[in-house]
């Protein structure tokens, strides 16, 4: 009985130490979510206005440009997958990977080859384990991305969209990331960045009661679009990275809270078992004392006779 009680006590100590760690990680993630939310909110107006500017240029001219011109029969697409560098975030990375797999299957069914680009060690490990080709990858900043990270990611993607497919280029550019909706809701989504769908933007503007402005372009609409292309791709990627970071922190906070709650329940269960073992040990000791006293009394009574 004593050995069993010691086992329970050691397990309670181990679970208590784990609970302290998960509680600390929960609090750290909660504090980082607030900062990430502010960055997301700050980046959205820039990305929105840049998209409107590109749409205004495209609708106000007949220029053919990778930003806005769809290929009649696209044959190759690039997919940028955003995952996390670290684990302990529930199904955050796996949900994004599943969304990327669904997108890849859809593009393949449309007769398009898929070039994969990955952000985050989890995605790199997933594709590496399955020996799948990855065009390029970036790691080390998923929980706190900077605009410079978005620029480094955008560079090879812009180069690919500007090339002909015969030279290794792509006709479409897609991104898969986790959209931050609220502290409790984060959704893995896929979005086509290029070519930009002018009909969707115009429809959204109409729904909001906005009128797209008309411009005169100097020196030309093509030159303006050339200047806007890298800014547009960088801003879209940066906003996606920020939303993914906020989603990662929210998922980690939720996972750590669940782990902390489970640790608390386990401690209660182990404490009950330890108390039961202690009571059984005490009962056994009392029984032994009573039994010994009874035997001694019987022996004494026998000697008196």
From Swiss-Prot:
Main location: membrane
Subcellular location: Cell membrane
Keywords attached to this entry: ATP synthesis, Cell membrane, CF(1), Hydrogen ion transport, Ion transport, Membrane, Transport
A GO cellular component annotation in the UniProt record: plasma membrane
Keyword Membrane recorded: yes
Biological processes, Gene Ontology terms: proton motive force-driven plasma membrane ATP synthesis
Membrane topology: Peripheral membrane protein
A Pfam match: ATP-synt
Single annotated GO MF: proton-transporting ATP synthase activity, rotational mechanism
Subunit structure: F-type ATPases have 2 components, CF(1) - the catalytic core - and CF(0) - the membrane proton channel. CF(1) has five subunits: alpha(3), beta(3), gamma(1), delta(1), epsilon(1). CF(0) has three main subunits: a, b and c.
Record-linked HAMAP family: ATP_synth_gamma_bact (MF_00815)
Family, per entry: Belongs to the ATPase gamma chain family.
Purpose of the protein: Produces ATP from ADP in the presence of a proton gradient across the membrane. The gamma chain is believed to be important in regulating ATPase activity and the flow of protons through the CF(0) complex.
Record protein name field: ATP synthase gamma chain
Organism field: Streptomyces griseus subsp. griseus (strain JCM 4626 / CBS 651.72 / NBRC 13350 / KCC S-0626 / ISP 5235)
């Amino acid at each position: 009985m004593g050995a069993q009680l010691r086992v329970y006590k050691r397990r309670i100590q181990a679970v208590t130490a784990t609970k302290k760690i998960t509680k600390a990680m929960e609090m750290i993630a909660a504090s980082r979510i607030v900062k990430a939310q502010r960055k997301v909110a700050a980046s959205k107006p820039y990305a929105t206005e840049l998209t409107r500017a590109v749409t205004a240029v495209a609708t106000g001219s007949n220029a053919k440009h990778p930003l806005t011109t769809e290929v009649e029969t696209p044959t190759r697409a690039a997919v940028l997958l955003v995952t996390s560098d670290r684990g302990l975030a529930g199904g955050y990375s796996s949900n994004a990977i599943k969304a990327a797999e669904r997108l890849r299957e859809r593009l393949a069914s449309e007769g398009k080859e898929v070039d994969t680009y990955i952000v985050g060690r989890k995605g790199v490990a997933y594709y590496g384990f399955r020996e799948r080709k990855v065009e390029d990858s970036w790691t080390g900043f998923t929980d706190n991305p900077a605009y410079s990270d978005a620029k480094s990611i955008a560079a090879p993607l812009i180069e690919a969209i500007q090339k002909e497919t015969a030279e290794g280029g792509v006709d479409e550019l897609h991104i898969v990331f986790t959209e931050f909706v609220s502290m409790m809701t984060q959704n893995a989504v896929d979005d086509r960045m290029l070519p930009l769908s002018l009909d969707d933007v115009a429809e959204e503007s109409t729904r909001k009661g906005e009128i797209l402005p008309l411009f005169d372009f100097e020196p030309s609409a093509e030159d303006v679009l050339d200047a806007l292309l890298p800014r547009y791709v960088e801003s879209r990627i940066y906003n996606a990275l920020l939303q993914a970071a906020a989603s990662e922190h929210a998922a980690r906070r939720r996972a750590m809270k669940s782990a902390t709650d489970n640790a608390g329940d386990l401690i209660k269960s182990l404490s009950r078992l330890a108390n039961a073992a202690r009571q059984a040990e005490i009962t056994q000791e009392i029984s032994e004392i009573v039994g010994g006293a009874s035997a001694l009394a019987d022996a004494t009574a026998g000697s008196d006779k």
